[in-house]
Amino acid sequence: MPIGHVFAAGGSIAETPVQRRARTVRHVLALLLLAAAVFLPGLDNYGVYGWQEGQRLLVAQQMDARLRASVTVRDAAEALIVPRVNGLAYVAKPPMIYWAQLLAARATGSSPELWHLRLVVAVSGVLGVLATYFAGRVIFAGALLAGNAVAGFDGVRVDARLADRAALWGAALVGTGTLFVRSGRIGELDMLLALSCTLAIGAAAWSWETWRIAGRASRGGVLMAAASTVAAALCKDPAVMIIGLGGYAGILLYAAVQPGRGGPSRAERFVPPLVAAAAMLVSLRTVEDPADIAGAAIVGALCGALAWVAVRLCAPDRFVPALRALHGVRAWLVLGLGIATSVLWRIGVSRLIGPAEARSLLGQEIDDNLRVLVASAPLNNLWACLIGVGAGSWLAIFGVLWLVRDRPRLPAGWWTLVAWIGLNFCAFSLLGKGVNRYLTPVWPAIALLGGLTLVSLLAAHPARRMPAWIVAATVVALALGQSWYYAAGRGRFYPELSSRDLALELRAMPGLDTSALYSFEFASPGLESYLGRRIVPVGGLRVNIGMSGGPAITLDELSQRVLDTGEALLLVPASIGDELRPGSPIDRLARAGFTLTLRPTTAVFRHSGKAPIALYALTLAGPSEPVNDRTASPAP
């Protein structure tokens, strides 16, 4: 079935194919303008923000330098396949984000800069909005190709026209969603993952719908799902899991809710509560705060729900049709290609850097991200879901309440949306530590549920409904407000959260030797990208070597270096009055035998939003000597 037929499903019976296509073009153009206004203005008006953005930029810059210096094909392959930071292999993430920056830089005839990173991510955000529209049209309207209306929110009959509008509003809501926009404006690679996963899940839904209607999955849908999954696997490791749960596990959920030959089995009555209780008890061991007890209860509930689905699928009359459908949509091929892509990349890395180092780096990444049944994780994820898509999140809450209250019989294709949200929330809550950006690929699904709720509410109360132009004006206001904030407002209100001004001031200081520059108990790849060299961290960092760009040195090692060179420059997180507070960084350095002389700077940089970074010149003093210029305070 051509994709145009799916996109055309949103019109009324009286519409001609030409009118349907024209409406789709209008929708796409409107969404394109909206997304471009949100994501593209003032890309590099604000400097590097946060560790994530600095690391993505620094690795791309060093990959570009290695590629330009390559002499042999092997050198070039090693530069492209094995990302490095300060000479150390950094394979925590696949290289797609770095390749994209290199392509953008080559297209402009330059080396990677902040503008290229933000352009790549912003374009992914724009395309992600359009991909959300595509997925919504397939999921909502595709289930209604036969013209059958479906019971929607508050008794509304969701016909093809309302399904079309739900996809439109869902895409508009994700394009103005708080955390989705944030990811698209600060250089996070999760935006590339969200784009790829949304395309893959939409294509998987298209394949399933055509298989159900025609008995054969669309080749275009299968190929699109496979290509998007391969691209997603080169963005970030959880890609195959996200696509598998969002794009294909909906088939399993749909099979699980089908009535069986008999009533509920004994296993259905006893296994889920036992699993829930056991999971809650395990999760309680991770409680660090009284509020985490509620998180442990949520962990138990999620595990119990998954156990119920698993028990239901044990019945052959449910499992066999589900297995047949999964084979029909070629889920094994799509997901297999994604897994193979990830495995082949890691094999290439292993051959280039050695199996031992590759295993060590993989182990560090797993240890850092895999957290099983942590009580705080679902609470963190719930909070992220409440704000992730802005107005779309709150509308989605009404949609969830409708599903719980009315328990409508959903079309088969709509279970893709349920799985996309529900199962991925379960996965990140039961196996992760509750980092909100990890849910970025789920924001389009939440926005689509919000869009469905919105059109249902407007249709359910025609006497009280707001005119469409008021809703549209609200969305446009959200778009323009966020566009202004990231293009201009952020620099006006929070200039200290970027390292750019401090880096430029350091570079302009006469006689400043940046080769003797160190940082105390923090690492900033953003600063390093601006200065063009590594800043050696001193002291504990609480992160692995790959994240810090190399090993830190101890105070004793710093003392030896100062003894050899006579002086060192140290960037220290230091607030006003730190020199008088026992245990502060200034106090600890003084007790270690250093004389600290403040080098005043006008630029203010707060690493991770904490204490401002002050520049000190270090020389050696006796352990009992006072700290020189201790009355001088760092910038507020």
Regions from the PLM with identified roles:
Residues Q55-A89, M96, L103-A107:
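Extracytosolic helix-loop segments that constitute the early lumenal/periplasmic catalytic or substrate-binding loops
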Residues V71, L145-R161, A200-M224, T229-A232, ...:
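Membrane-interface transmembrane helices that cradle and orient dolichyl/undecaprenyl
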Residues L117, V138, R182-L193, K236-P238:
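Short acidic/glycine- and proline-prone juxtamembrane loop motifs at membrane-interface regions
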Residues L119-A160, L199:
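Transmembrane-helix motifs of polytopic, lipid-linked glycan transferases
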Residues S183-G184, D190, G432-P462:
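Hydrophobic/aromatic-rich transmembrane helices and adjacent perimembrane loops
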